[in-house]
């Protein structure tokens, strides 16, 4: 009997402590939950005098002893705009840029069976080497999206390539009759030995598996990102159209060793082709499509850009009244 994939994704948004860097007194810290911004109240007034500086987020997290057989990663979905991450006082890494996710591995940085301290130092001050420098929006400071603790096997689909899923689906040639796709899969071997494994790729529609294949791979020791490609063709694909038929296939990539599923990633796939003509406009799947859009910033009153799921619900409800074509 085949065992299930071992990846675990733990949301660690609750019970953080926050204070500004100039608040040296520990009593100045206050409890916050993520997502969080320190500009929720002062940035929406239309002025440029809102707080821009350094904020410190700390969290105690117990690392279970049985996790010693795993690999541990911290995934940040958004923090603005320069973030430095520390574990137990040791610097893990820096991310520069406020509008992209980032991941750091902490496997050998934590103490197992003990409480560990995370510190994230976020700076939304002006950075001349970090884009954008100006904009018609506020540069909110804080960890304004979710933070995850990822646990994987020593052999895994790598989350270390710019915090991607590790599965890239490259649409090489698309027509109404067939879709030629290349799946670029990033693997990672955290051990010191060459390991043999099997990659299984499945493409599912709403009811069944429409394509399946397997590939044997040799995983190089101590490798953060090892690229493996699997090319495949979908016959008579169901084409994606954002307004009429926003259907997406689900591509499931599984890493298997000795009959055991070590890791699994699901990646949506919207098959489509398009062209733009300077005189005739935009064509999606061979049909002319007028494009309309608006400028909608990621912010809400009282919370700034630290959006919760209910915030997205409200924003999407409003977008439907604008007849957006995405």
Regions found by a protein language model. Name each.
Residues 314-326:
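Single conserved hydrophobic/aromatic residue that forms the stacking wall/gate
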